[in-house]
Amino acid sequence: NNGYAYYGQNDAHGHDEVYAAEMVKEIAKKIYNSGQVDFSKYDNDNDMEIDFIYVIYAGKGENYTGADPYTIWPHQWFMETQLGNYWTGRYACSSELFIEEHTQQIDGIGTFCHEFSHILGLPDFYPTNASSGGSASTFREWSVMDYGCYDNYGFTPVGYTALERYSLGWMDVVEITSPGEYTLPAIDTAQIAYLLPSDEKLSYILLETHNKEGWYQYQPAEGLLITSVDYNRSVWKNNAVNNNLNEQRYKVIAADNDYSDFTKQGDLFPYNGNDSLTLYSAPKSITGCGIPINIPVKNIKYSNGVTTFSIIDRTETSVLQPNLVTDNGLSYSIWDNKIQLNSDTETKAVIYSVTGRIVESVTLQPGTPTNITLPEKGIYLLRYNNRVIKITN
């Protein structure tokens, strides 16, 4: 009933869902008044609520560079209105056209796949609140719930990750419980991924193989994609998975340990000689919320869509206790009057008593844990790299 600028206008908070929902309501009522649609076909669970409505609106969307700010940003939201005996609930929408450098063409399916995935229950994996997360996303092209929906201008959006498939009930993941040699074909052909559990039930690491074929052909690289998950129902429900830079609850563990937007080609294992993920590697086997997972993955190899790797018995490495603390390139853990130190670089570390007496002085080697026995329980000072921190046994 109105022009695009009416439905695309923003409210006081910068959101256009209120007016866009009005558009969807008007469309739904026009369809109902036509008398040509049997709404029971769209109520799969027979609860008298239409399961969802999807609208592709004419013209372009606000999500593309240089778009008119009065166009509608594609989104999923809620709109309740009665249509005879039925009610509406969730809806999603996206644009007809794709705009790039002053040209326009029919939009690809990428944005549709992203918004439809919201309807299915998946959250965004980019930070939805920039003020609290900044550039907290590590996914970009790796997930359709981030920038991956725009691969090949939206005509070849990236396929779903292991967590996305697992969350939707489309595949199971196999928990690794014992050391051995493992083979992992590409997720798109074998529908399999491995899970490394932690002592925290809802925190774990996922291993999945990606090759540059099919829906994955426009990814930056191929190999073993390793991600960490720290599931929290409330955070998922509120669509705030990666809004906290210090608690990224679903993140890529990048093989090159570089999380900038322009180094995605180095995210998958193996890369540039890095073929392992342990508590002492760089990057470390630690989730985005700081949960250590002491299941060493080594000898990662990738060839022709298949990854092989070794799971090493954790008793073959020094076990880092769950109270892991990481500080400026050094990690330490204290238990049973012992402290274990591990550094990313060769550095000298000195432990002092509170009276200034030297308890131990050692030179740490990268990747080699050092265990020190403390004389008694109490407070100590740890000095390294011209830093002094207090530790409590």
PLM region spans:
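Short glycine/proline-enriched turns and hinge-like loops at secondary-structure junctions
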Residues: 138, 217-220, 343
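C-terminal outer-membrane/trafficking sorting elements
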Residues: 321-393
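A mature extracytoplasmic/lumenal domain signature
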Residues: 59, 211, 230, 313, ...
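Active-site-proximal segment of zinc-dependent metalloprotease catalytic domains
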Residues: 1-138, 142, 146-154, 159-172, ...
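Non-catalytic C-terminal accessory/binding modules of secreted extracellular proteins
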Residues: 21, 65-102, 168-318
